[in-house]
């Protein structure tokens, strides 16, 4: 069973991961695709794959039921080598989590080469590649396990349209847990720690997925999908950044994933009924369904 799939930055490669403990990389050419590589290294089902920004090289992260996060890199062989071309190697094996690592998420590239990891052991880890080595922080986040994690845009909302923009880069992310909560974390450069700045309550069952909208206009949006058959869209205005309000969207099935369009104005929701629905905010600030996509 395939659990996750992701296109690289250029849309030329697709990585998939599966219950068979492997990751497969396909080359996409027009309407066709070709299996280019099968990566083996995990000892359990692989839940998540995530491509890093190409400015850091061709790097892929994967997380698994085995409690590990693996970082893979494509190394280009010497043109004079008999096996000229490229080969994938495992460059980092992070195994400090004591239970399944359910999701990995790369930070916006402006913030650096940072990977956040969400685990069923209740902890979040943040890996950073700097000066040719990997460092990590690991900290407790949700008592009953962390299911999902998503970074905020590097620029604060309103910074593009403000006459007095604030400091440029922020390191901030949201987590969703089996305690039914969302938590927002901010990095403190002085203490070099991630601290909870907000806890968002509203769901009555596990939060399965969270997604921070990439939009950096006047508002911030976070979508959360829950076992309670609802999606909540949390909104915070740049004029009052600590205040979050939510709007609830109701469904007939358990919900698994939420995903924003690149511009951050359309939300895709998928659940247990094999449907994807697309939602958009109207001029009154209400979220409306604009399309259903069925298999």
Swiss-Prot record:
In terms of SUPFAM superfamilies, this protein maps to: WD40 repeat-like (SSF50978)
Q: Where, in residue numbers, are the WD repeats?
A: 1-36, 41-82, 96-137, 141-195, 202-244, 250-289
**What GO terms in the biological process aspect are recorded for it?**
COPII-coated vesicle budding; ERAD pathway; mRNA transport; nuclear pore localization; positive regulation of DNA-templated transcription; positive regulation of ER to Golgi vesicle-mediated transport; positive regulation of protein exit from endoplasmic reticulum; positive regulation of TORC1 signaling
Q: Which InterPro entries match?
A: G-protein_beta_WD-40_rep, Sec13/Seh1_fam, WD40/YVTN_repeat-like_dom_sf, WD40_repeat_dom_sf, WD40_rpt
Q: Which Gene Ontology cellular component terms are annotated?
A: COPII vesicle coat; endoplasmic reticulum membrane; GATOR2 complex; nuclear pore outer ring
What keywords sit in the KW lines?
Cytoplasmic vesicle, Endoplasmic reticulum, ER-Golgi transport, Membrane, mRNA transport, Nuclear pore complex, Nucleus, Protein transport, Repeat, Translocation, Transport, WD repeat
Summarizing the function annotation, the protein's role is: Component of the coat protein complex II (COPII) which promotes the formation of transport vesicles from the endoplasmic reticulum (ER). The coat has two main functions, the physical deformation of the endoplasmic reticulum membrane into vesicles and the selection of cargo molecules. It also functions as a component of the nuclear pore complex (NPC). NPC components, collectively referred to as nucleoporins (NUPs), can play the role of both NPC structural components and of docking or interaction partners for transiently associated nuclear transport factors.
Q: Which protein are we looking at?
A: Protein transport protein sec13
Species this protein is from: Aspergillus clavatus (strain ATCC 1007 / CBS 513.65 / DSM 816 / NCTC 3887 / NRRL 1 / QM 1276 / 107)
């Amino acid at each position: 069973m395939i659990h996750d799939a992701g296109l690289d930055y250029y849309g030329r490669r697709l990585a998939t991961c599966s219950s068979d403990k492997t990751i497969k990389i396909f080359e996409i050419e027009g309407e066709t695709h070709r299996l280019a590589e099968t990566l083996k290294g995990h000892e359990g089902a692989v839940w998540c794959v995530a491509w890093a920004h190409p400015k850091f090289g061709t790097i892929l992260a994967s997380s698994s039921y085995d409690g590990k996060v693996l970082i893979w890199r494509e190394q280009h062989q010497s043109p004079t080598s008999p096996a000229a071309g490229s080969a994938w190697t495992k460059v980092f094996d992070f195994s400090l989590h004591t239970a399944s690592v359910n999701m990995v998420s790369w930070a916006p590239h402006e913030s650096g080469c940072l990977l956040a990891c969400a685990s069923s052991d209740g902890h979040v880890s943040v890996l950073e590649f700097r000066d040719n080595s990997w460092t990590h922080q690991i900290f407790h986040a949700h008592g009953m396990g962390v299911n999902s994690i998503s970074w905020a845009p590097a620029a604060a909302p309103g910074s593009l349209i403000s006459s007095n923009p604030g400091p440029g880069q922020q390191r901030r992310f949201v987590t969703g847990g089996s305690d039914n909560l969302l938590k927002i974390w901010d990095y403190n450069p002085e203490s070099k720690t991630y601290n909870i700045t907000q806890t968002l309550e509203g769901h009555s069952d596990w939060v399965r997925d969270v997604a921070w909208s990439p939009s950096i206009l006047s508002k911030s949006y976070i979508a959360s999908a829950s076992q309670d058959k609802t999606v909540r869209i949390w909104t915070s205005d740049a004029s009052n950044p600590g205040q979050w309000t939510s709007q609830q969207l109701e469904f007939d099935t358990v919900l698994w994933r939420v995903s924003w369009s690149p511009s951050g104005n359309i939300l895709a929701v998928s659940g247990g009924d094999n449907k994807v629905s697309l939602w958009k905010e109207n001029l009154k600030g209400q979220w409306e369904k604009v399309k259903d996509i069925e298999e």
